[in-house]
């Protein structure tokens, strides 16, 4: 029997990470804690960069934008998940699903682009230190962030609009804790060739493109560091990009891990569990990575809490 084609659907069902009732309180507490830590940590980074004039530099300007993107990124998925657990409902409206998917794609792409921009900033700082302030002027920094927003927004809108053209069947269960683009497309009854091509193109543009840029920047950075004669000079140069390199590694490794897990198991629930790493863990860990070894951030936060300028 052929599935019924329904173009006037009103809602989807999010199956979540687990269907076990006894696990729901634990999941609620765990993800609420992770969400609050993520929002608070990234807000502190933004507060530090705004309040301390010494941090009004391109590196911290990009970092504050990344923190804002991380707050928005995690806020597109976790609050709805917590509401569903608390109300014991798995339903999300059609409009809500499309909106969630749109913003998830937007801020996921923005994260990737901002990491590439930050890699370029570190490249200029280490490879062209004498011309750093001239090259990384406020106008260029603003344009780089604006371009990142525009590219991510155009991709998000195009992906979402293509989903709106799809027809869906009676099986509207999404084996995930949020409306993930690939999962939603696979529920469609109509032809998804254009959607699949759009996803692959976007993956190449917003994942492959920034990754190539980051690798090129760091290849130049490594060459410059190797040319430095003193060990102290090498350590100082490397320490300026160590935090960014850690965040990039975390972002890429978790994303690759989710992809490999999905390809190896073909189990949607396993994929959903693995995706927690890049949707929740990465935004949560970023503030800790940037602040633990960053004396400037620590000093700015101490001054903010003490009420000093």
From Swiss-Prot:
Q: Where does this one sit in the cell?
A: Cell membrane
Kindly list the residue ranges recorded as spanning the membrane: 26-46, 55-75, 100-120, 140-160, 198-217, 238-258, 272-292
Taken from the UniProt entry, a GO cellular component term is: plasma membrane
Q: What are the protein's UniProt keywords?
A: Cell membrane, Disulfide bond, G-protein coupled receptor, Glycoprotein, Membrane, Olfaction, Receptor, Sensory transduction, Transducer, Transmembrane, Transmembrane helix
Q: List the disulfide bonds.
A: 97-189
Q: Which GO terms describe its biological process?
A: signal transduction
Cite the ranges annotated as topological domain Extracellular: 1-25, 76-99, 161-197, 259-271
What is the membrane topology listed in the Swiss-Prot or TrEMBL record?
Multi-pass membrane protein
InterPro entries under this entry? GPCR_Rhodpsn (IPR000276), GPCR_Rhodpsn_7TM (IPR017452), Olfact_rcpt (IPR000725)
- Residues annotated as glycosylated are 5
The record ties this protein, via Pfam families, to:
7tm_4
MF terms in GO: G protein-coupled receptor activity; olfactory receptor activity
Cytoplasmic compartment spans: 47-54, 121-139, 218-237, 293-309
Family as reported in the entry's similarity comment: Belongs to the G-protein coupled receptor 1 family.
Q: Which PANTHER family match?
A: OLFACTORY RECEPTOR
Question: Its function?
Answer: Odorant receptor.
Recorded protein name is Olfactory receptor 7A17
Native organism: Homo sapiens
The organism's lineage?
Eukaryota, Metazoa, Chordata, Craniata, Vertebrata
Its encoding gene is what? OR7A17
